[in-house]
Amino acid sequence: MPRHWNEHYSDPANLDFTPVPLLVEVAERMPPGRALDLACGYGRNALYLASLGWQVTAVDSSPVGIGILRERSASLAVDARIADLERGEFPIAAGSFDLVCDFFYLQRDLFAPIREGVKPGGVFAGAIHLVDGAPGARPRNPAFLMHPGELRNEFAGWKILYYSEGAEAGRSRRAARIIARRA
């Protein structure tokens, strides 16, 4: 998988450094602390959080993406790491982060470590593609798609601050989006 993303990130036309709107909403309501950006790509969300004073750990399997992030974050508090999450190369330490974000990367066995990695009172913010997207939309592999309600169920017992399912304006792929606070 890194090969595909390395090629994708090598084309400047594919790089948009605008943070995900859901993350902006979260960051505006929290004081800076420690954040984890999973499957960060070239780091648009990590850069945004760091610009607000967050200490960010950003993880991705793409050396090209992490290289771009490292270049752009030289003066910011970003620890950019190359790690294959599917192989367990980045263990998430319990109670380490005030904020964990995961946008459009699904690895179901990461949810338990993610929940443990968020400090009590901390927040998870994320969005995952749904199986009922438009025909031809990507990703197509069912392993990378959630069923309606599945993301909400992963955070049962947490305070759900925001939850929605549907397509964003201008997008064909439907997604589940969540902001949840650990009790």
Model-derived segments and spans:
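Conserved class I S-adenosyl-L-methionine
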Residues: M1-M30, G33-G41
